[in-house]
Every structure is written in C-alpha cells, then in structure tokens.
C-alpha cells in the first residue's frame, strides 16, 4: 500500500476521477489513465464476487497503481481509497492509511463536512446546481483549508468548461467517457488550475502533505 502522505498529496492534486464497474476496469481503465484520469472509482454494485474482484483489483494495482488512485465502493476489498455512496453506513477503511470519500446529498455535508472524510463527490449537472454553488462558496477548490471535492455527473468537455468558469476545479465522470473526451477534459482542467490565482500556493502545500 502507498504511504499516508503520498495518498493525501495525490487526492489533493487530482483533477479527474472516472467511475466504472470494477469488472470492466481491466479493459477500459488503461486507456482512461492515458487520457488523464487521476482517480478510478471502481464499483461493485454491492454484489461482489470477492475472489474475482480482488484479482482484478490486484492486477490493476500492479500495472496502474502508481499512475492512478484506485477507489472501491465496499469495505470488503482492500484498496487505498474507499467511497461511501448514499445509504452506506459502514465507514470502515480498507486499511489504516486508506482515504475515505463521501458522495454528498445535502448542503450541510458540504458546509460542515464530516471530518471522517478526506474528499467529497458533489452531484450537479449544471453550474447553477445548489450543491455545486455551496461547494464553490464554502470549500474553494484550491485552498489549503478546503476539503477537496469533485463535481460529479455525466459531463462532456463543453459542460466541464462551463463548470470551470464557475469555480469548479475537479470533476468525477460518472459515465466514464471516451479517451478522446477525457483528454479534452483533462486539458480544460489543467489550464484552469494554472490560471487559478491560488494555484502556486496550493501546489506547494499539496506536494508536502
């Protein structure tokens, strides 16, 4: 497993997360990583074949683990990152250094985030989404004291550009997307980070965490 500080730095510096079924990841994820994915959220749908899923995960760790953070949606699989989706009550971590993320449903989860979580996924299909507005205002993306969060949805490059213009700096693609689209999205976000007035200070902070 990766050491704690490295995991923390990697989630702070992540721009693009992609969500896809774990069983499809062996075929699809290598291309998505080349396209710019920093985090892969691998879903099991709650009906895990633990032996099969563990083998897939270990193979992915072996070949891609230094290039992408691998997140799972279940405590049954040991990974460096775990995401709690709505309705999940079990907050156990896959191992003591693992990062825990939360897919939020209410503004209060953004305004006063639970200290158990190291990052958030904020659903919102448009820049005017109340949850996204709350996230930009209460957790400015490139600030040291903010909880890192991803705008989550089935975005294309055009919608990501619109989100960036309202202050979004990380996206979570719930439908995976094509490699070509991912490359465009990654470039939009890279440019937004470079042009953000908080970027230099945030970068210095993040790499030391």
Q: Language-model segments: which ranges?
A:
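N-terminal amphipathic alpha-helix/helix-capping segment at the start of soluble metabolic enzymes
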Residues: 1-27, 200-209
């Amino acid at each position: 497993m990766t050491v704690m500080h490295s995991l923390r730095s990697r989630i702070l510096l992540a721009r693009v997360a992609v969500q896809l079924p774990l069983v499809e990841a062996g075929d699809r994820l290598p291309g998505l990583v080349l396209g710019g994915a920093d985090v892969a959220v691998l879903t099991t749908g709650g009906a895990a074949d633990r032996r099969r899923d563990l083998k897939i995960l270990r193979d992915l760790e072996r070949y891609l683990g230094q290039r992408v953070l691998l997140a799972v949606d279940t405590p049954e699989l040991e990974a460096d990152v775990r995401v709690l989706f709505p309705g999940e009550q079990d907050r156990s971590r896959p191992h003591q250094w693992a990062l825990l993320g939360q897919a939020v449903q209410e503004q209060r989860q953004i305004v006063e985030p639970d200290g158990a979580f190291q990052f958030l996924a904020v659903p919102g299909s448009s820049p005017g989404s109340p949850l996204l507005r709350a996230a930009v205002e209460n957790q400015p993306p490139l600030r040291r004291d903010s909880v890192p969060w991803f705008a989550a949805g089935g975005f294309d490059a055009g919608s990501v550009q619109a989100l960036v213009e309202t202050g979004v700096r990380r996206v979570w693609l719930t439908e995976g997307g094509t490699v070509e689209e991912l490359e465009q999205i990654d470039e939009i976000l890279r440019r937004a980070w470079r042009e953000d007035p908080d970027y230099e200070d945030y970068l210095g902070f993040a790499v030391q965490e």
